[in-house]
């Protein structure tokens, strides 16, 4: 395998992980939005190190969600287009927080 082939293979694997993480996270967050909205709340927090999220989207995808700013931007844009405010913050090196809200948008 040449260096170029190795690079292309690595790029393809990275793109595949990005796509899987994006799709699984969108599905998970949509389920959570439906659940929280039915309870009458207007926001919720998700944590990439949370066992429920890891079980739903996968460990690799959860790590990608926590550390990939391009994935975070893509998710933010997707949900903003649907009327949700999504913010990502990092409290420390190992813990990040995702807040999804829609109350501000109702005003």
Regions found by a protein language model. Give the residues of each.
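A general, composition-driven signal for non-globular sequence regions
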Residues: 1-3, 8, 70-72, 93-98
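Short, charged/polar micro-motifs that form catalytic or ligand-binding hotspots
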Residues: 61-69, 90-93
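C-terminal edge-of-domain segments
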Residues: 73, 78, 83-107
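An N-terminal amphipathic alpha-helical segment
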Residues: 1-63
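Well-ordered, non-membrane alpha-helical segments in soluble/globular domains
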Residues: 26, 65-75
């Amino acid at each position: 395998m040449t260096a170029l082939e190795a690079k292309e293979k690595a790029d393809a694997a990275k793109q595949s992980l990005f796509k899987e993480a994006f799709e699984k996270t969108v599905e998970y967050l949509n389920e959570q939005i439906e659940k929280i909205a039915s309870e009458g709340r207007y926001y919720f927090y998700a944590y990439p190190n949370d066992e429920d999220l890891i079980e739903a989207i996968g460990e690799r995808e959860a790590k990608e969600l926590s550390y990939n700013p391009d994935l975070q931007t893509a998710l933010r844009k997707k949900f903003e287009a649907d009327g949700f405010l999504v913010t990502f913050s990092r409290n420390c090196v190992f813990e990040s927080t995702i807040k999804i809200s829609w109350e501000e948008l109702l005003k």
